């Protein structure tokens, strides 16, 4: 019997009482904002479901979007209506008490390019008296405004209902008064604010500084004209009372070679505090200098209040892919505990100038191992242990900041954390709850020139520079991480479709419209296995010589997890954990494995934890709800001890962050279940749990 069959059997007989929706304004019973609030605290004051009764939770309703792709949405609930962006970027409104569909908006109605960006949430806005309401969603490079009651486009917004962002959008922005503050996925780094009624640009802050702006001297002169990256893709948080928005940014590009971007590269890999009304910079802290390892900040800053040295401090906490927590006074930017600059390995790549030091917080302690040593070799079997020992001796790990090299090294902490986009939850007592990955990866750079120094053919060279990081040197991709194989792509898409995607971008893939057309055609010819000149009739070598000086001499060899012979992470467990950290003291309260491989548990191996994507929700009922794991299970943990109090199977992996809300006095916990991560089956379902009806 399959897990989906078991799940459907568990659902059978559940009564789905129809409860009338409310048109009231938002309340504490709602989940009206991505991650629960503009503070991104992932906290709910609801208490109906608590430690004493959580074991009685049952499926209340389900809804199938009909899509089969990764479903990472943190769903909104306002006035008894649940709003979700489906895996194919549809926007759907459901009765939050029954799961009954109320309306559905399909971007195909606007001939929109859906892209493939994982859409993790929506933005709901209403004016003070609730007379004006809008629901914002990103599809491809467009920002759309919908009527929350009908799902119809609001045509007076932007140009006929949408604004061209010139960049994809995976994480929703944040509302301050009547402006929507947004980041993006690619392009030249900037955070922007738009008028919620008209779509007009209200302000812009350049994250790759221009002449006269703070940080301009941390880049080569004139870099702002061509440099890309530093975008805040993971979202923002807002101190609404003070009018301060907090932004977490990504790596400068190219991610793994910085020979053309010498310097610290502000404001990449930084927490930046801006005046929300104007975009004026208030303070910043760069968490990774001159990043060469794609260690961008993966989750939005979280706002909380702690007691520090006997005083109440309004703080902001930022998690990282290294499993580190940086905590600052959110008004002044001063760290609550000292941050040390420590020497890190230097690169031996020609033309690279790695930054000599990197910042490390003295507290809290890292939430994961910071170096893979021989003591971490996998102990699942003698054969596995020997295999991992042999590899770590041949390709040693150099800690959290290995210098990219032509020699292979073990990358640990890995490319996907540490912490990831789910982020952490905080309760009013100042305790931070967060899930962490402990998965090793492999790091290696490749040359874009032949041994004699002459350039590789133009198409192959551009593939290594622009495509191999995700699709691999061998073009096989990494489907488990969402990077498809390009082998035989001509059998799945037409040449025109491939050319359109290459030029305009698609999901996480950036647009290559700035690459000269002859180069783009040579790249396509290489991907399609055609002779280099066949795409345009122009000799490839002439094109290569013309632009040789602009091509990086090295490219990233691709994202590769390190696994053992059976496909498990090639390291001693735990492979995924859930952690509680008291940010009043900076001390770890508890750590437990998150998830399990049932076949290993059946052999008597204690729960190992699994790779995890999606975050936790803390409630005033003393609970933590989290799915995220590869074992297609949602769990409730005791906030005080980390003990599992309840768990239930999901039809697909819950690689999303739950929401909790109440309708007509009944509390629900809802999760998007779409799987697709870690090589697991993909779907597109929403599952809501509640206590049995009276």
Regions found by a protein language model. Give the residues of each.
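Repeat-blade elements of multi-bladed beta-propeller folds
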Residues: 31-35, 70-90, 114-142, 168-191, ...
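Gly/Gly-Pro-rich "capping" loops immediately C-terminal to redox-active cysteine motifs
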Residues: 157, 451-460, 472-503, 508-511
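Extracytoplasmic/lumenal domain signature
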Residues: 52-66, 91-112, 129-130, 142-167, ...
């Amino acid at each position: 019997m399959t897990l989906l069959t078991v799940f459907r059997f568990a659902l059978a007989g559940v009564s789905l009482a129809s409860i009338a929706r409310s048109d009231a304004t938002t309340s504490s019973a709602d989940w009206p904002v991505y991650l629960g609030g503009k503070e991104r605290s992932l906290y709910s004051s609801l208490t109906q479901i608590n430690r004493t009764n959580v074991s009685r939770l049952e499926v209340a309703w389900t809804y199938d979007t009909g899509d089969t792709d990764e479903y990472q949405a943190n769903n909104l609930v306002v006035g008894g209506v649940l709003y979700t962006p489906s895996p194919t970027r549809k926007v759907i409104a459901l009765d939050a008490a029954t799961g009954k569909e109320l309306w559905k908006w399909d971007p195909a109605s606007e001939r929109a390019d859906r892209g493939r960006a994982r859409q993790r949430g929506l933005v709901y806005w209403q004016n003070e008296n609730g007379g004006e309401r809008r629901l914002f969603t990103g599809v491809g490079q467009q920002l759309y405004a919908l009527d929350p009651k009908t799902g119809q486009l609001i045509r007076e917004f932007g140009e006929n209902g949408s604004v061209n962002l010139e960049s994809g959008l995976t994480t929703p922005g944040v509302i301050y008064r009547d402006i929507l503050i947004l980041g993006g996925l690619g392009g030249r780094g900037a955070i922007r604010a738009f008028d919620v009624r008209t779509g007009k640009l209200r302000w812009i802050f350049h994250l790759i500084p221009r002449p006269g702006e703070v940080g301009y001297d941390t880049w080569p002169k004139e870099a702002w004209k061509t440099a890309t990256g530093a975008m805040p893709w993971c979202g923002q948080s807002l101190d609404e009372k003070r009018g301060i928005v907090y932004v977490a940014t990504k790596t400068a590009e190219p991610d793994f070679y910085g020979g053309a971007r010498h310097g610290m590269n502000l404001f990449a890999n930084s927490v930046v505090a801006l005046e929300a009304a104007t975009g004026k910079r208030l303070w910043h802290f760069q968490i990774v200098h001159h990043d060469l390892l794609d260690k961008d900040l993966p989750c939005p800053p979280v706002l909380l209040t702690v007691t520090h040295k006997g005083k109440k401090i309004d703080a902001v906490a930022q998690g990282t892919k290294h499993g580190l927590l940086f905590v600052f006074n959110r008004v002044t930017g001063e760290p609550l505990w000292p941050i040390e600059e420590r020497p890190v390995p230097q690169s031996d790549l020609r033309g690279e100038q790695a930054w000599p030091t990197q910042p490390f917080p003295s507290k809290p302690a890292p939430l994961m191992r910071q170096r893979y040593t021989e003591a971490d070799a996998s102990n699942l079997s003698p054969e596995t242990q020997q295999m991992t020992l042999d590899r770590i001796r041949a390709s040693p790990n150099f800690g959290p900041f290995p210098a990219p090299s032509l020699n292979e090294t073990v990358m640990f902490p890995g490319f996907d954390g540490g912490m990831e986009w789910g982020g952490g939850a905080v309760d009013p007592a100042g305790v931070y709850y967060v899930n962490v990955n402990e998965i090793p990866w492999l790091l290696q750079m490749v040359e874009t020139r032949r041994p004699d120094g002459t350039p590789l053919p133009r198409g192959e060279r551009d593939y290594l520079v622009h495509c191999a990081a995700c699709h691999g040197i061998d073009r096989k991709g990494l489907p488990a991480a969402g990077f498809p194989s390009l082998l035989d792509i001509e059998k799945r898409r037409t040449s025109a479709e491939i050319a359109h995607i290459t030029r305009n971008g698609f999901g996480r893939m950036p647009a290559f419209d700035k690459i000269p057309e002859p180069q783009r055609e040579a790249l396509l010819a290489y991907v399609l296995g055609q002779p280099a000149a066949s795409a345009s009739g122009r000799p490839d070598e002439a094109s290569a010589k013309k632009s040789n000086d602009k091509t990086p001499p090295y490219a990233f060899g691709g994202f590769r997890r390190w696994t053992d012979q059976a496909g498990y992470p090639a390291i001693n467990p735990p492979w995924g954990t859930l952690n509680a950290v008291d940010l009043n003291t900076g001390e770890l309260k508890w750590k437990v494995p998150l998830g399990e491989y049932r076949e290993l548990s059946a052999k008597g191996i204690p729960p190992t934890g699994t790779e995890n994507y999606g975050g936790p929700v803390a409630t005033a009922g003393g609970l933590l709800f989290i799915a995220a794991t590869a074992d297609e299970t949602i769990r409730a943990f005791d906030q005080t001890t980390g003990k599992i109090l309840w768990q239930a199977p999901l039809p697909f992996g819950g690689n999303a962050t739950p929401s909790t809300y109440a309708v007509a006095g009944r509390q629900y916990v809802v999760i998007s279940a779409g799987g697709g991560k870690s090589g697991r089956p993909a779907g597109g379902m929403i599952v809501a749990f509640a206590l049995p009806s009276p």
